[in-house]
């Protein structure tokens, strides 16, 4: 039974675990300069992050950020008339709640209808905005749009 390899018999391969070199502990073993060379900034302390040795640093070479983010910007969810024709082929009155129920838009955001696609049925849209092309296509098919 002595030939079976057991956990306590395992040891790392020779040379796999090297001791780290402790510097600055006497002249005989990397003492004095501790591998940092003789004089200069990098011997005495670290250079700050982003320092490029006197060259104009990258963060100063790049232009400043311009403009601002408007906190009052209104983000509309868009629905094309092709999607309306697919979801409501029979036409009729459509509200934002109907679009949410069908999964076309998410709740809590304003909706805008855009004019990509064709309209065959008459839609009465309530509570949505519409682009000029969408408005003309819906009205040409006998529908109407109210934004209130």
From Swiss-Prot:
A Pfam entry, by short name: Ribosomal_L27A
Listed Gene3D superfamilies: 3.100.10.10
Record has rRNA-binding as a keyword: yes
GO molecular function: rRNA binding; structural constituent of ribosome
Region (Disordered), start-end ranges: 1-47
Superkingdom: Bacteria
UniProt-listed SUPFAM superfamilies: Ribosomal proteins L15p and L18e
GO cellular component: cytosolic large ribosomal subunit
Biased composition (Basic and acidic residues): 1-40
Keywords of the record: Ribonucleoprotein, Ribosomal protein, RNA-binding, rRNA-binding
Biological process, per Gene Ontology: translation
InterPro entries: Ribosomal_uL15, Ribosomal_uL15/eL18, Ribosomal_uL15/eL18_sf, Ribosomal_uL15_bac-type
Family: Belongs to the universal ribosomal protein uL15 family.
Reported function: Binds to the 23S rRNA.
Subunit structure: Part of the 50S ribosomal subunit.
Protein name per the record: Large ribosomal subunit protein uL15
Organism, as annotated: Bifidobacterium adolescentis (strain ATCC 15703 / DSM 20083 / NCTC 11814 / E194a)
């Amino acid at each position: 039974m002595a030939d079976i390899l057991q956990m306590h018999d395992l040891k790392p391969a020779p040379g796999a675990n090297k001791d780290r070199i402790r510097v600055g502990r006497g002249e005989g073993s990397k003492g004095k300069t501790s591998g940092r060379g003789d004089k200069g900034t990098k011997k005495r302390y670290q250079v700050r992050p982003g320092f490029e040795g006197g060259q104009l640093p990258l963060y100063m070479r790049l232009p400043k950020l311009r403009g601002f983010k408007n906190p009052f910007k209104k983000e509309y969810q868009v629905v094309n008339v092709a999607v309306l024709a697919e979801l409501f082929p029979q036409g009729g009155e459509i509200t934002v709640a109907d679009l949410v129920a069908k999964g076309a838009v998410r709740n809590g955001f304003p909706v805008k209808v855009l004019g990509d696609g064709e309209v065959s049925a008459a839609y009465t849209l309530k509570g949505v905005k519409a682009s000029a092309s969408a408005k003309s296509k819906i009205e040409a098919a006998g529908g109407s749009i109210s934004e209130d």
